[in-house]
Amino acid sequence: GTEYYKLAAGKAKEVIDGVENHIYNYALLDEYSQVYSWEYNNKNKELLLGIYYNRDQTNQAAPLTDFLQDMAQGGWGDTNGEIKFWKAFPEGPRKDATYFPKIILSDGELHDWWYDTDPPSREVVAPVFMKTVEGAVRGTEFDYTNPALVNAAGEKTLQLIRLSQVYCWYAEATGRSGEVNTKAIEVLNKVRNRADGQETNFYKETMTPEALAEAAYDEHGWEIAGYYWGGIASRARDMFRMYRYKDHFEYRKENPLIKVAEGIERNEAVPVTGTWDDSKMYAPYPYEDAILNPNLK
């Protein structure tokens, strides 16, 4: 309800005030390309909560999860971007740093993600996220033009909460509380200006509370797109909170073709079937627990 959004806005405002009053030593990085870079891996000043790794001691397993299996660098194909979301994603430095600009397949050539052979042979044709990747040589930036195999043992910091997310949460919670204020517009524009790579100041104080809330909801989704390792507050959690899985389920069942380039249309390789019920929003209880306690349903 509205009262909880007011509490959320108040808590986010505490963080924002702490940053602005130099109580907390956090700030947005200047460029979005720096956020998930190796250069700022251990000195990301907008990271409020992270899990740090050194693969000489303990590694994480993220580097190969987003590569498609037919990519030259050696991928696991655990994830891929959704075409509709990619299409709606505003152009600019944020989008450029979120997705592979080009992908290298087994032929050693650079291709747009929507490339396929004639006749079609690729199992998955989809946008590819580029946030968890690490350089083929340890301690270097990832180069998407380099076909060298990437080590599966990663040591990039897993970023759970960033300051830009707090800005989005404050703006959304303010809007869902039925309000619009100068600070909410200001911090949301900080996020969008960096994403655009210029001072667009896209959002105005003339917005309605509903428009502000939806804008902040969208900005948060774009800000953390493809980064499911930040599971505390992924885009999926936003969709769950707003009860938007059902509509998206129905859209994915339709699976329409989407224009991705001149004369080229693509749709999702993974079909969605069946009839919606709210149980689809939840993971099932582990079998071992369910057989011990029949009340778990």
Give the positions of each predicted feature.
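Short coil/turn linking the two alpha-helices of tandem helical-hairpin repeats
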Residues: G1, R176-E179
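Hydrophobic alpha-helical scaffolding
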Residues: G1-Y5, F85
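Elongated scaffold/linker segments in the mid-to-C-terminal portions of large proteins
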Residues: G10-Y167, R176, F240-K297
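C-terminal structured "cap/appendage" subdomains that terminate the fold
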Residues: A184-L257
